[in-house]
């Protein structure tokens, strides 16, 4: 009678694989494996930590004023290297690593170096946007509220 192949069967060196078994094609090379992301290596990591702490302290007030979710896509060489979400719409406010859990009202696509200049106050956000230094998707007018939050944080 017909015998069903054992799906748990092992292939030993030199054996030919059975019908339902697959061949191991070798292991991935070192360069093909993704490198662990070290957040502290990014220029702006300490800035995000400070802003997150500020939101924890005064988040409830900010939620009343802002009522929006912002997603910051930080890029380097045209590729997104980091995403942060500032949720000032739900609960007492939150800032977390990763894309927005709920649909973001405004998404900023900002190069790492430009974001540093924005936060430090070297360049005006509106002028930088009009000059094409970063992109905004969604409700562009809400970006002015985020600018105020950064200014309040910078005063601390």
Curated annotation (Swiss-Prot):
Superkingdom, natural source: Eukaryota
UniProt domain SCP2: residue ranges: 44-156
Q: Where would one find coiled-coil regions in this protein?
A: none
- Identify the InterPro entries for this entry: SCP2_sterol-bd_dom, SCP2_sterol-bd_dom_sf
Q: What is this protein called?
A: SCP2 sterol-binding domain-containing protein 1
Q: Taxonomic lineage of this organism? A: Eukaryota, Metazoa, Chordata, Craniata, Vertebrata
């Amino acid at each position: 009678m017909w015998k069903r192949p054992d799906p748990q069967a092992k292939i030993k060196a030199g054996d030919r694989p059975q019908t339902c078994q697959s061949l191991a094609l070798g292991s991935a090379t070192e360069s093909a494996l993704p490198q662990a992301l070290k957040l502290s290596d990014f220029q702006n990591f300490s800035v995000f930590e400070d802003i997150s702490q500020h939101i924890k302290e005064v988040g409830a007030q900010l939620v009343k004023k802002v009522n929006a979710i912002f997603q910051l896509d930080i890029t380097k060489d045209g590729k997104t290297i980091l995403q942060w979400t500032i949720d000032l719409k739900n609960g007492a406010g939150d800032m977390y690593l990763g894309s927005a859990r709920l649909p973001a009202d405004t998404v900023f696509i900002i190069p790492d170096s430009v974001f540093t200049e924005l936060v430090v106050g070297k360049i005006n956000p509106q002028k930088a946007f009009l000059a094409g230094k970063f992109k905004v998707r969604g409700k562009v007018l809400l970006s002015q509220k985020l600018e105020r939050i950064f200014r309040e944080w910078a005063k601390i």
